[in-house]
């Protein structure tokens, strides 16, 4: 294995227990309860289930890149929100502004002046409370992470909110296998899952960067951070979940990677599993996907590689 690493920030902060969380449990009956307005029934084909097959996702979602900011939670949540909006309304109305979400996360966590990362719970709550504006109205510029979005962005965000969301409750799952099946049922119900995990050295290797194949961490590997991502499917053949990263489309498998079932389902390695169930139907004035500067989405690893400096 090539163990040379690429400089990256992560930004996932594990949430503390909160009795106010809205919880959801997926069982066999639940899978039948949830329907997709895209009118396409989710199927396991040749042992593979992939939510990307039930909706048409814009390439921009594969290209999102958090750059050197610790905004992984905002990136993962923006992806899940965009997926929910497309799934519900059969159209790509807009690209959620990740920098808008990241600012509001840190505002609620009292860390606006720091590139501190955030909790997934906080990010989910911000798009319920404030909504989210379009990316081309508050472009992802890492140098502006301390800047409060303009009032126009907040006005636009009012029409784009998550009105229903929940954290997956694994209380009744007594084994890793139970958790694996529970996560698969949630995906089969039509929901991408935002979650956080412990990052080890091998995740940063050139092998993973090129192949998108992640292995279970070795006992001698050092823990180097926490990262938030979004699961979109699973592969029964190699026992992995299909996961969306936020490091650009040149990383892994067009921005995605395969993560072992037992990695994702180990409560010591992964936690905070959230879904966005329902969003409002935003009508964004003068929206044109072509207005979004590709460089503002896919920063690649060499943009701002020296770190973000603020005076």
Curated annotation (Swiss-Prot):
Similarity comment: family membership: Belongs to the peptidase C1 family.
Biological processes annotated in GO: proteolysis
InterPro entries with a match to the protein in the record: Papain-like_cys_pep_sf, Pept_his_AS, Peptidase_C1A, Peptidase_C1A_C
PROSITE patterns: THIOL_PROTEASE_HIS
GO molecular function, one term: cysteine-type peptidase activity
Protein name: Uncharacterized peptidase C1-like protein L477
């Amino acid at each position: 294995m090539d163990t040379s690493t690429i400089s990256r920030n992560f930004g996932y902060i594990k949430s503390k227990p909160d009795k106010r969380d809205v919880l959801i449990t997926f069982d066999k009956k639940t899978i039948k309860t949830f329907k997709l307005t895209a009118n396409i029934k989710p199927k396991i084909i040749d042992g593979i289930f992939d939510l990307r097959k039930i909706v048409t996702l814009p390439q921009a979602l594969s290209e999102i890149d958090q750059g050197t900011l610790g905004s992984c939670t905002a990136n993962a949540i923006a992806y899940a929100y965009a997926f929910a909006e497309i799934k519900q309304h059969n159209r790509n109305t807009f690209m959620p502004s990740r920098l808008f979400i990241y600012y509001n996360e840190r505002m609620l966590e009292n860390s606006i002046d720091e590139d501190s990362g955030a909790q997934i719970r906080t990010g989910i709550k911000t798009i319920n409370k404030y909504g989210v504006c379009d990316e081309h109205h508050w472009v992802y510029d890492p140098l502006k992470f301390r800047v409060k979005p303009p009032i126009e962005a907040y006005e636009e965000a009012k029409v784009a909110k998550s009105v229903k969301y929940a954290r997956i409750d694994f209380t009744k799952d007594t084994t890793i296998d139970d958790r694996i099946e529970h996560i698969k049922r949630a995906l089969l119900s039509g929901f991408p899952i935002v979650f956080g995990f412990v990052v080890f050295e091998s995740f940063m290797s050139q092998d993973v960067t090129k192949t998108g194949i992640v292995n279970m961490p070795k006992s001698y590997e050092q823990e180097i951070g926490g990262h938030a991502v979004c699961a979109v499917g699973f592969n029964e053949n190699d026992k992995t979940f299909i996961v969306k990263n936020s490091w650009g489309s040149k990383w892994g498998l067009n921005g995605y990677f395969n993560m072992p079932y037992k990695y994702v389902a180990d409560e010591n390695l992964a936690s905070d599993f959230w879904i966005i169930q329902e969003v409002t139907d935003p009508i964004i004035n003068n929206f044109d996907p072509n207005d979004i500067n590709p460089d503002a989405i896919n920063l690649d690893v060499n943009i701002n590689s020296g770190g973000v400096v603020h005076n």
